[in-house]
UniProtKB/Swiss-Prot annotation:
Presence of the UniProt keyword Transferase in the record: yes
Domain called N-acetyltransferase: residue spans: 35-180
Enzyme Commission designation: 2.3.1.308
Organism listed in the record: Homo sapiens
The keyword Membrane belongs to this UniProt entry's keyword annotation: no
Catalytic reaction annotation: N-terminal L-methionyl-[tubulin] + acetyl-CoA = N-terminal N(alpha)-acetyl-L-methionyl-[tubulin] + CoA + H(+)
Name assigned to this protein: Alpha/beta-tubulin-N-acetyltransferase 9
Molecular function, one GO term: tubulin N-terminal-methionine acetyltransferase activity
SUPFAM superfamilies in UniProt: Acyl-CoA N-acyltransferases (Nat) (SSF55729)
Entry similarity comment: Belongs to the acetyltransferase family. GNAT subfamily.
Function: N-acetyltransferase that mediates the acetylation of the N-terminal residues of alpha- and beta-tubulin.
Length: 207
C-alpha cells in the first residue's frame, strides 16, 4: 500500500516500518522457508524471485497494508543497526471486502522464536489496529487463525476480539473486533505511547 510508505510507528517494544524490497533477501525469505511458519500462516514456499514479486505487488495494492516488525530494543540500542538485523516479523491489514470498506482482516507473524511470548506481537497488533482506525477509517477487524495456534488465539482474545466462526474445512477460527466508542477509547489508551514518524525520505523504489 502506497499510503504507508512514509510511515514509521515507534512503540516501546516494536518499531513498524514499511515492507520494502530491502527486507526480502535477508530475513524474510529465510523465515518463509520454515515449515512451521508456512503452517501457521497458511503460506506456500516461494522462490526469492516470487518473494520480490509479492513484495512489489503488496507495495502497490491499495487493499494491502504491511509493516515489518522490528525489535525496538535492538533497533534503538545499537546505533547504525540495520533494519534487517532487527527484523522479527510482520503485521498486515487486508481490505478485501468490497461490500464493507470499514472491515479489515489483520494478521501478525513473529517469526523469530526467541522474540515470541514477550509482547511484541501484542504491541504490533495494537499499533496496527490504531493505524487502521485513524488513518484507514476502519471500524471492524477480523483475524483468521489456525485452530492449533492457541497462543495467537489467546492474544487476540485479550485484545477484545471475540470468536465468531469456525471452519473445519480450513481448520481455522475467525475472531472479530467491532470498534465501538468505548473500544476506540481503550485502543487510544493502549497506544498513547506509539509515535508516528516519517520513514526515511518517504520515497519507495519503483517496481
Amino acid at each position: 500500500m502506497r499510503l504507508n510508505q512514509n510511515t514509521l510507528l515507534l512503540g516501546k517494544k516494536v518499531v513498524l516500518v514499511p515492507y520494502t524490497s530491502e527486507h526480502v533477501p535477508s530475513r524474510y525469505h529465510e523465515w518463509m522457508k520454515s515449515e512451521e511458519l508456512q503452517r501457521l500462516t497458511a503460506s506456500e514456499p516461494l522462490t526469492l524471485e516470487q518473494e520480490y514479486a509479492m513484495q512489489c505487488s503488496w507495495q502497490e495494492d491499495a487493499d494491502k497494508c504491511t509493516f515489518i516488525v522490528l525489535d525496538a530494543e535492538k533497533w534503538q540500542a545499537q546505533p547504525g543497526a540495520t533494519e534487517e538485523s532487527c527484523m522479527v516479523g510482520d503485521v498486515n491489514l487486508f481490505l478485501t471486502d468490497l461490500e464493507d470498506l470499514t472491515l479489515g482482516e489483520i494478521e501478525v507473524m513473529i517469526a523469530e522464536p526467541s522474540c515470541r511470548g514477550k509482547g511484541l506481537g501484542t504491541e504490533a497488533v495494537l499499533a496496527m489496529l490504531s493505524y487502521g482506525v485513524t488513518t484507514l477509517g476502519l471500524t471492524k477487524f477480523e483475524a483468521k487463525i489456525g485452530q492449533g495456534n492457541e497462543p495467537s488465539i489467546r492474544m487476540f482474545q485479550k485484545l477484545h476480539f471475540e470468536q465468531v466462526a469456525t471452519s473445519s474445512v480450513f481448520q481455522e477460527v475467525t475472531l472479530r473486533l467491532t470498534v465501538s466508542e468505548s473500544e476506540h477509547q481503550w485502543l487510544l489508551e493502549q497506544t498513547s505511547h506509539v509515535e508516528e514518524k516519517p520513514y526515511r525520505d518517504g520515497s519507495a523504489e519503483p517496481c
